[in-house]
Amino acid sequence: MQHCPARAARQLAAAALALVLLLALAAPRAHAALQEKHGIRLLTFDHSQILSIGNQTSGKCSWYALRYARTILDGRVCSGSGMWSNGAVWSAGGYTGYSGDLSACLHTIYNELSAGRPVIVHLKNTTVSGVNKHTNRTSTYEYHLSGSGWTQVNYPHIATSDTYGHWVCVVGIRADADPANLKESDFYALDPARVSANGTLALTRLLDGTIWTANSPLKIAG
């Protein structure tokens, strides 16, 4: 049989192209774009995937926050397999620690979100004035998504241990936030304690004074 080098080369090139396309489709996404949704610039993600993970079980906020982050980055539900050992195994989820003062942390969160990557943030309680109960807390308001926009709900009683703190997955920022003058309250998170409010996606707005800068404040992708 006579061989045709040109035909063989074309077949090889076609096979190589098919393999590249297959690998590209199978590879996880590296980022998710920020898009404005009713006044909040929010990373794009499938809300149903986050809701399928649901709210945390006791003591596992770090693991749930990591699962939310990986789900957003990969575009598929993260089971969290291999990512828990008496606390989230950050490296198993492709996250690493970042430390700095408050200004550095806020700008890092802003830059990571702008690059399409969720940030996992370590919170401590702060004292809130003008309330009748639960004066020490990590959050005050949450926002429920409906067809007409976000509904603000006063849900004040999320508080945390002074020893361990609380982990959330930051996924959004106020549309009118000033990059030169950032505040904690500019940012919105998927809070493992309340990511699902009876099946409705809920975002929690960070409270000023809650990022635990002295104790492993951020986990970032990469």
Per-region residue spans from a language model:
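Bacterial N-terminal signal peptides that target proteins for export
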Residues: Q2-A16
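Bacterial N-terminal signal peptides
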Residues: A15-A24
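Active-site-adjacent structural segments surrounding the nucleophilic cysteine of cysteine proteases
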Residues: A26-A92, G147-T160, L182-E184, A197, ...
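Well-ordered beta-strand positions in beta-sheet-rich domains
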Residues: R29, W167, T200-L203
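Solvent-exposed, acidic/flexible segments
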Residues: G54-W63, S99-L102, L106, E112, ...
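Substrate-binding cleft of extracellular glycoside hydrolase catalytic domains
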Residues: G82-T108, L113
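Active-site-adjacent substructure of cysteine-protease-like catalytic cores
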Residues: A104-L190
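Active-site or metal-binding loop neighborhoods of secreted/extracellular toxin and effector enzymes
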Residues: I173-G222
